[in-house]
Amino acid sequence: MRILGLDLGTKTLGVAISDEMGWTAQGIETIKIDEAGGDFGLSRLSEIVSQYGTDKIVLGFPKNMNGTVGPRGEASQSFAKVLENTYNVPVVLWDERLSTMAAEKMLISADVSRQKRKKVIDKMAAVMILQGYLDSLN
């Protein structure tokens, strides 16, 4: 069972995958997207889903700190429907509050340069989202 973890932004989509046992999450890549133009990187995502035999997707669901759903959360809900219809696999919306900030802090503490952080932050956030979900199962 392989589970895909995604962190949706307006310009990038962070991608992570679980190991076959569903214990650990590893970052795969950051896909460039254009949310405003309707390009969500589905062609590349289709290759990844096929390559890993994905049977579930965990999508980061950004809520406001008070638990309400704002514009980014609504965008994630819409994208979840697209994913379900495109790949015919269940999509779990996972509370991702502060995941990008936590990923940034981890990269800063590892002394990763600002330029390198920009390239991997969304992939790291996807790892944290997926790992949080996997930990909740085990």
Swiss-Prot record:
Pfam families: RuvX (PF03652). GO terms for cellular component: cytosol. One of its GO terms (biological process) is rRNA 5'-end processing. GO terms for molecular function: nuclease activity. It comes from the Bacteria. It is found in: Cytoplasm. Transmembrane segments: none annotated. InterPro entries: RNaseH-like_sf, YqgF, YqgF/RNaseH-like_dom, YqgF/RNaseH-like_dom_sf. Belongs to the YqgF nuclease family. This is Putative pre-16S rRNA nuclease.
